[in-house]
């Protein structure tokens, strides 16, 4: 194992050297990972929004965001500040409790998914053995918030949008889970750390995308549908439902839906990187590179550099997936609701189930 840096011990040692007591350092450490996680997730969303607007503008031969900061990089932040100062309007005949809780129930489970995303062997907030099941479980809670928002708005368009979101999630959650289970069978583990380590031995040739090409394609389609991205944005189709479940929302509650959508897209891209593209592993095994350069893997400088390389590789693969999803948005038309459900139940479900059975059969045959 190359990366043996213990972030918690390093943090406690650093503050002890500054003269702080051990108890104070531990108390300071407890909320720090969650706080950093939220900050990184929000910054990641701002970057994704800016990239989408610039790439979309390039596809349509426009300039895109230009005035707020260099190349318009501060435009998403300006939009967020604008929404923060907007008036919060609640429908007079709506269900106030459901209307208020809906956006929070959508966003919180998606943020929890970041707890098990690894950026390195020890660069993970919570390395639990059932990490993949945890992600599938918490991601299935978000559609309940959409349904609550649609019902609590007391608006027919909002309610229809909430129903569509629930039906869409049910249709694509099962194929997504089956694709992930195929990867878990190959890796003999449900831990995200173990899944990446299984792929890192032979470099790019060991990545799961070569062993699970059908599962990778099915995973991408199901992930885009779960994120309600075009061509699967039926719950908020403007031409049919005004804005779907978001119709009655204003201010930061309205902004929470957009944050949830982009955070979910970023999480899906991170898991695509971890499950199929080797996560933090380089295309060439790091041990081979160290031997060629005559470097010692136990040196702290080498470990720090390898940690930063791992983070960079994870983000590079993640943003490659995001780039493909943005291009898909502008190259494919929106499907009808019957086509959406047919694709999920009649095509993706049998394909992902067959892929799982084939993977299990090969594992049994190789025992």
Swiss-Prot record:
GO terms for biological process: aerobic respiration; photosynthesis, light reaction. It is found in: Plastid, Chloroplast thylakoid membrane. Pfam families: NADHdh (PF00146). The keyword Transcription does not apply. It is a multi-pass membrane protein. Coiled coil: none annotated. NDH is composed of at least 16 different subunits, 5 of which are encoded in the nucleus. NDH shuttles electrons from NAD(P)H:plastoquinone, via FMN and iron-sulfur (Fe-S) centers, to quinones in the photosynthetic chain and possibly in a chloroplast respiratory chain. The immediate electron acceptor for the enzyme in this species is believed to be plastoquinone. Couples the redox reaction to proton translocation, and thus conserves the redox energy in a proton gradient. This is NAD(P)H-quinone oxidoreductase subunit 1, chloroplastic. It comes from Mesostigma viride. The gene is ndhA.
